[in-house]
Amino acid sequence: MERLRYLYEQAVDGKKKFVYYCSGCDCVLELRASSFDAHLPASSCVNRSCPLDAPGPISPPRPETLFQRASSIPHFTLGFPPLDSLLRPLSERQLVVFSGDYVSTVAELAALRAQLPVESGGLDSAVVFIDGGNRSDPYLFSSFARQLGIRPHVAMRRVASCRAFTLYQLAELVSERLARTAEDYGARLVVISDVLGTFNEPELDEREVRRVLGAVYEGIEELKERSLIIATLPSRNKYDGLVVPWADISIALSHSRDRVRAERLGRSGLAPDVVTFKPNLLLKAARVGVRR
């Protein structure tokens, strides 16, 4: 009986180890210094009650195990309850647009959280990060990694970063290269930071902007077939109204006095639509159990 293979890497005594889990009972099968063929049978499970090692036919699952509450199914989270309450349900094949203050912080947090195991609210995945406005912050990313006990240089190796200097470079990256790059890296999360960061030239013709953004939109729609996409709009731009409607989920953040106000736009009948929190808590969001 085959079991679940390599799930993630962890450092043990300063050395990288590959962790393998049993698909029957979630027990750790073993740690290895290197990976091995995922199609080969795994070692016997140490759990004597593991259903995969039971003799004879395996009993069919009970009816209650065939259906699960949505809240019990692992899904990607930012690990920051105030924002996670607005994002549910969050899954792949979605575009989430964050606009306003602190959205670059959210982008760095998401790029780190996506690398965590699924059981910890991550995607167990590499990340593709397109920087459209020179907004990436490796120091903040490293801070989030340290909060989770992850070596920053190890986490950074799982982020494929690319800087776009013109709107045409951004359009080419997203429409022609992004889907292939995400597939090559196995990235289940793609971050497009400051989508409109290069759309700030005063002589730009609006028809040309619409044409270029149309190419960006088509690239995002293609990518949504396999990945979750987070896009940010950190500063106001007259073309925001062309991008926000693309979103499956749109979150607007604004800073007033000592609080950040986050609102999910375009949603009614599902609470909460608005939350507030202290900005310093977001900088510590990688830590478990952050309170509002």
Predicted features and spans:
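P-loop NTPase motor core
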Residues: 179-246
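Conserved inter-motif catalytic segment of the P-loop NTP-binding fold
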Residues: 128-201
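Cys/His-rich microdomains that often coordinate metals
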Residues: 29, 49
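Short Cys/His-rich Zn2+-coordinating modules
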Residues: 1-10
